[in-house]
Amino acid sequence: MNVDRSTIIDNYFKIWAVVLPITSFLVIPFIQGTTPAYIFALLSILIIPVLTKFKGKGSDYIRDLLFFLYIYICINLIGQLYLSFDIKFHPDFSTVRIIDDDDISTTVFRKSMFTQSLYLLAAVATFVFVKNFYKPNWDNFIFLGACILGIYGIYEVTYFLLFHENGDFISNRTFGDGTYSGSFFQTITIGSLVLQRLKSLTGEPSMYAFTILPFWIYAIHKKKTLISLFLFITLMLTTSTTAYIGMIMYTLIRIRYFGVKDKIVLFLIVIGLIVCLLNWDFISMFVNATILEKLSLSNDSGIERFMLFTNHMDFYKNLPLFTQIFGMGFGVVRSTDMFSTLLVNNGVVGFVLFTLLFFYPVFKLENTYQNIGLKAALIVIYFSMMISVPEYSYLSTWLFLGMAYNMIPKRNIAYNTSYTKSNLKITG
C-alpha cells in the first residue's frame, strides 16, 4: 500500500470520526440506517479492498471481517436450523418486546433478523477498520466529533432555557411508520426549575451518556483536560442514570489502579461533596428524581425496565434447551437491557462471545495510562449495555473496541512504560 493510498484511508476516517457519534440525523430521511457514520462504515467495506488490493493491513481487514461474519452466520444458522425442526415450539411473543411487532407468528428467519444484521455489519466494519488502521493522530478528530456533539447539546439546553421549547433543528430520524421521532425531547423538574435533559444528536439523554462516557474517559487518559471537563459537564446535564452510574464505575476503576489518593479521584470526590453540602435540598430532589425513583421502581421508567427484564428472562427460561444455548436469532427481541436481549436472541453462546470480545483487550493490554483508559472505557460500555442500554449499533462502542484491539500487538512501542500505583505520575 503506497503513501497516497494510506493518506486516503487516514483522511477518510478523519471525516468519518467527526460524524461518528451522530445517530438522530439521516442523510436520506426516508431510509433507515443512512446516518453519515453508517454510510462511511458500509462504504469502507468496498473502499478498503480497492485501496489496499487485499495486501498488508487490507488483507488483515478482510480476514477479520470474514471471521466475524463466519462466527455470526454459524451461530444464527445453528439456532434457526433447530427451530425449523422443532415444530411443537410456538413462542408467545406477547410478553416480550419484539423488534418487528407486526409479525407475532414467524419463528424462523424473521425479517428483523436481516434488517438488524445490516446495522451490525456497519458496527463490525467500524471495528475492523479501526482495529487495523488506527493511528494516534486520529484522536484529535475523534475528540472533535465528541465535542461537536456536546456543543449542540449545550445549544439545545440553552435554547430551552431562553425560549421554553425544543431547539433541535437537525434531527430527522423516525421509527415505525414514521410517526415516532428518533429524537426524544425530555425535561426534568427539580423544585421550581425545569431543565431540558441534554441529548444532542443521539436520540435521548441516556444514549448521549452511553455515547460520550468512553470519550470522556479517554480524554482524561490522553490528558485533554479542557475536553474532559467539557464532556463531564455535558454528561451531568443529561441527568441520566446511565451517566452517573458510568461515572461511579470509572471512579472505582481509578481507585483500583491508582488508589484513593489519585488526584482525579480526589478532585471528583471533593467537588461532589462541596456541591452536595452547598445545595443539599437541590441535590436531594435531583438524586431522587434521576436515580432513586428509578431504582426503587417508583417511576414509570424503573417499573417498565424491571418488568421487561423479568418478562424476557421468563421467556428465555421457557425456551427449549438448545435454543437457550444458541438463541432465537439475532434481532428478534429488544429489552431495556443487553443481558436478557442477548440471551433470548443468541443464547449462552452469544452472551459468552460478546463478553469475551470486550474483556479480551481488558486482560491483554498492559497498564499504560492510555491503555487503562481504554480498559475503563470498555468496562463502562459493557456494564452500561448489560444494565440499561441494549444498543449494539452505536458506532462509538465499536470505535473504542477497535482502538483497544489495535493497541494489543504494539503495546510496548509508543507507550513502553508499565505504570503502577507507585510510579504513575498524572499531571493536573
Q: Where are the regions that the model predicts?
A:
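Membrane-interfacial helix-loop-helix modules of multi-pass inner-membrane proteins that assemble, modify
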Residues: L83-D101, I151-L201
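TM-adjacent membrane-interface loops and short helices in multi-pass inner/ER membrane proteins
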Residues: D300-R334, V348-F351
